[in-house]
Amino acid sequence: MPTEGVIDIVCNLFTEEEVRLGRTGVDEHFLDQVRFPRELRNGVSVEVYLEKMDRAGIQRSLLIAVRAGDLRVRHSFEIPYERVADICQKYPDRFSGLAGVDPTRGMQGLRDLTHAVREYGFVGAHLYPHWFEMAPDHARYYPIYTKCCELEIPIMMQVGHCLRYQKDRVLPSVGRPITLDRVAIDFPELTLIGIHVGYPWTEEMISVAWKHPNVYIGTDAYAPRHWQSPLVHFINTWGQDKVLFGTDWPVIDPERAVADVGELGLRPEPQQKLLRENALRIFRLPESNQE
């Protein structure tokens, strides 16, 4: 197993500032559900998280400037693009930005996405369909998909079910993996990444990724030791070019995740593709920190 050079394609800011300002989208009930350590619940500084990355062998993490729901609706939240851009600028060898997208913002949202890519150097877009209560194939997302094609960036989105992130606002699970089928047909130039492994419809996610050359799977939010056997087999054999490693920190600890991958019994080449090579290719990331 490689001890360095890993790329984590899904990482959330979970610092004291984000916790204090209510920019995490989760409450104590959710943190209890995922067994998040109590000593870390007030947030983890970027510097401390970099130490975690170092111990895990993670070279670079893709940091999400989240846009979670219509801000006119209670409990929706965002992390400003500028916040993520500042961190990426401070640590350009360790972080790259992902621009959260919000279909309720219309043309301004498209301008924001363009600015994030062209001015801040963000490498992709990120969508939370359940926060907008619209499936990935809803027409309101299509202008965003078009803009991603124009900017030549991939877009990742949560597929599968969603948990109860907050007791006071329960979101519907709108992201069945099969909904990416229509999007992939309508936008053959768009790179789509279904994150959260599509659970509990993981085999459905595998089938969509195998059908379409522009659809990929992100393995975040579920500890590798609990991945379903069809996914592990897909990664190790015929789907080795279609799957990318992620944590969804703070949901999954990066040290645990990388260690778990090493226990899956993957062959060296598929494992390297999962942990590094596929992400480098799809997000056009530099091969080393010196580039």
Where are these regions (language model features)?
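Mid-to-C-terminal alpha-helical segments outside catalytic/metal-binding sites
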Residues: 1-60, 114-115, 239-244, 252-291
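Catalytic pocket-lining loop regions of alpha/beta-barrel enzymes
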Residues: 120-124, 134-244
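Conserved, mostly hydrophobic/aromatic
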Residues: 10, 53, 84, 88, ...
